[in-house]
Amino acid sequence: MLNRIVIMGRLTRDPELRRTQNGTAVTSFSVAVDRDFKSRESGEKATDFIDVVAWRQTAEFVCQYFTKGRMAVVEGRLQIRDWKDKDGNNRRSAEVVADNIYFGDSKRDGQ
């Protein structure tokens, strides 16, 4: 079976490095990805906000070199998580687990 995803978009906020109880580096952030078509109603392109999680060296790399607004290319796999909200309701969310993250622009373009 195959579960691969590649997205390109801009980070919506600065990533922050966290550590699990055993010291593993992790970060999560969102990437704003413009759709290829315009809305009939507004004439503007819609944007999808895609959640991404990165672990270990990938997390450290993202936190060191990427900031809000920077264009990124993310390769990874789609993961669906089931969880309960504060009211006990079952919820489901999708996120990309990043294997690799590349610069989608030059440093000059991203600042």
Predicted regions and their residues:
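Single-stranded nucleic acid-binding surfaces, predominantly the OB-fold ssDNA-binding core
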Residues: 1-111
